[in-house]
C-alpha cells in the first residue's frame, strides 16, 4: 500500500534491491552448505505428536531437493529469501529423508523447491533424483511440485509420471506473452504448452493448478482475453476438470 501511495519504505522492515542496506537490518547471503536429510527419529523424540500429525495420509509432507531460483520475475521474493544461486541437495540425502517418511506411512510428498526444475541445465539433475526414487523402491507414492513447465523433455516427463507425480503448479501469471516479458519471467508460452503436451503424452491425468495474476503491468481487456484463451488451451491438453 505504501508503494502504491508513493510513501517511503524507510520505516519498514524491508529493503529495495539495488539500494544500500540500511542500518539496523540484517542482510545475510544464503549459504551453499549441502543440506542433509532431516532426522525424523530425533524429531519424534522431541515432538511426541509427530506420528499423530502424520496419521491419515491424505496430505503432502514437504521435502526440499534444492534451494534458490535463478530467475528475475518482478513480483517474486524467492531470490531474496533463498538467493539466485541454485544449490542442489545431495540426491542420497533427499531419498534418505523420503525413506524415513515412507517408513512412517507417508505416501504424499511436496517438493518445496522454489522451482523443481529451475532451468534446462537442471533437467538431468531432476532425472537423477527421480531414478533414485524408483531405485529406492518407494512405490505407491504421489508427489507434487511447483515447476517451470518450459524445462522438460520427453524422458523427464515420463519419469515424473512413473514416479507418481499427481499434482503440479505452474505460474503462468498471464496468457499474454507481452505481459510475461514485462514481468521478466523469461519463458515462452508456446514452449510451456509443448511441455504440457509431453506430460499428457507420458500419461499424466491428474490435477494441474495454474497460477494467474490479473491486473498486472499493462493489463487490459485484450490481455485478459488472451489469458482466458490460454487457459482453454491447457484444458484441451489435460481436460477441463483437472485444470484449475
What are the residue ranges of the model-derived segments?
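Catalytic cores of alpha/beta
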Residues: 156, 218-233
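Acidic, low-complexity intrinsically disordered segments
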Residues: 1-97
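Conserved SAM/AdoMet-binding glycine-rich loop
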Residues: 91-209, 214-217
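Structural recognition of alpha->loop->beta junctions
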Residues: 1-11, 159-167, 228-244
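Residues that line or immediately flank small-molecule/substrate-binding pockets and catalytic motifs
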Residues: 7, 80, 113, 172, ...
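Flexible glycine/acidic-rich beta-alpha junction loops that bind and position SAM and/or redox cofactors
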Residues: 9-11, 71, 119-121, 178-183, ...
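Hydrophobic alpha-helical scaffolding
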Residues: 66, 84-87, 146, 185, ...
